Amino acid sequence: MAKRTPSIDTKNLTAVQLMELDACVRCGECVKWCPTYAASGGKPGLAPRDKILRWRQYMNKSYGLKAKLFGPQEVSPSELEEFKDDVHGCTTCGVCATVCEAGINTVEIWEAIRTNLVKKGIGPYGKQSAFPKLVGQYHNPYMKDQKDRLAWVPPDVKIEDKADIVYFTGCTAGYNQLALAFATSRVLNKLGIKFAMLGEEEWCCGSALIRTGQVHVDDVARELARHNVEALQKKGAKKVLFACAGCFRAAKIDWPRLLGKELPFEVIHITQFLADLIQADKIKWEKPINKTITYHDPCHLGRHVGVFNAPRYVLSHIPGVKFVEMDRSKEFQRCCGAGGGVKAGMPDLAVAMGESRVKDALETNADILSSACPFCKRNLSDGRDALKSDIVVEDIIELVAEALGLSTS
């Protein structure tokens, strides 16, 4: 009698990741910190520890001693479907990795498992499955015309055809959250920074595909990275600026992995760029912002890349600003809820997480909740609205523009 085929396989999981899965000691520290678990009201399947233990159980059924002696035990399709839902209910924020006593790199594991399941036809979740087709066809996830990439640019903004510095706008700022694009471009002009943009040659960074386990689908993610790098080189880029934390993370970490080589230019977040200018005394403020401001660390900018100080340095140097920290900040911040495809796949869960983060901000009595990512701004605003709060949600670059006397509309 032929042995049953294993229900799962180990593809996309490295030897190190397999050892990390085995290293979990079930202490539960990650459960205390997980924002999706908390926002769900304590749904056991969303707890990081539970996901690791379940996958380990599936591995034992497929490849353990009993499986080798008597053949693999089946993991039912319904069980794998439920697991798929739970593993996609994670924003990949990385706080579980931060607090893990065993040092498990959970973000890499979640993305590897998602990819593994998608390759087997299990997942992704809901609307997430449309990402490869949309981005592959339109080169952005919003089905917008690429010719409109620079349609937002106002007459007062000067853009070079080629320059050492290129501003990578991102799909969300370029199409949906224009205030961030207005603010970034006008701030650069005000500071005398000559910069270029890619226009219709700017394609999606690919973050949504990678985060949702679809990095391999039709090789779209790799093609996006290749095209963007080549387009940036043609513009003469030596330094590429990002005001979107998701795009920044994709360029900084994912593009080199996809292409198998280092990038031929420096990638830097706008807060790092501004912090350097402030330190060099090259910014002359024109208008004080007499408000109390707190700051939310985008997961992709903070825990994923390690940029914590630059945003705070910028905020603390804006005249009139009283800066206050939330209890959970920097490495231990609470995710806004927008990442990992959750905003698209599970919007109600995303907003519930946004509400939790806004409550953290309200405890500081801040007038303004700031961040440095359009996705964070969107979901924090949704959380604020759900709470019927009057706290203002603004991106750091908008605040910088205001303090320089510039319009963001």
From Swiss-Prot:
Q: Which Gene3D superfamilies match?
A: Alpha-helical ferredoxin
Question: Might you give the EC number(s) for this enzyme?
Answer: 1.8.98.1
Taken from the record, one Pfam family name reads: Fer4_8
Q: Which stretches make up the 4Fe-4S ferredoxin-type domain?
A: 14-44, 81-110
- Which gene holds the coding sequence for this protein? hdrD
Q: Tell me the keywords, alphabetical order.
A: 4Fe-4S, Iron, Iron-sulfur, Metal-binding, Methanogenesis, Oxidoreductase, Repeat
Name used for this protein in its record = Dihydromethanophenazine:CoB--CoM heterodisulfide reductase subunit D
Q: Which organism is it from?
A: Methanosarcina barkeri (strain Fusaro / DSM 804)
Task: Give the UniProt family note.
Answer: Belongs to the HdrD family.
Question: What residues does [4Fe-4S] cluster 1 bind to?
Answer: C24, C27, C30, C100
- Kindly state a single biological-process term from the GO annotations of this entry: methanogenesis
**Catalysed reactions listed for this entry:** methanophenazine + coenzyme B + coenzyme M = dihydromethanophenazine + coenzyme M-coenzyme B heterodisulfide
What exactly does this protein do?
A: Part of a complex that catalyzes the reversible reduction of CoM-S-S-CoB to the thiol-coenzymes H-S-CoM (coenzyme M) and H-S-CoB (coenzyme B).
Q: Extract one GO molecular function annotation from the record.
A: metal ion binding
Keyword 4Fe-4S, does the record have it? yes
Q: Which superkingdom, per the lineage? A: Archaea
Positions binding [4Fe-4S] cluster 2 in this chain are C34, C90, C93, C96
Assembly information from the UniProt record: The dihydromethanophenazine:CoB--CoM heterodisulfide reductase is composed of two subunits; HdrD and HdrE.
Q: Which InterPro entries match?
A: 4Fe4S_Fe-S-bd, 4Fe4S_Fe_S_CS, Cys_rich_dom, HdrB/HdrD_reductase, Helical_ferredxn
* Pathway of action: Cofactor metabolism; coenzyme M-coenzyme B heterodisulfide reduction; coenzyme B and coenzyme M from coenzyme M-coenzyme B heterodisulfide: step 1/1
Q: How is the cofactor bound?
A: Binds 2 [4Fe-4S] clusters per subunit.
Cofactor names from the entry are: [4Fe-4S] cluster
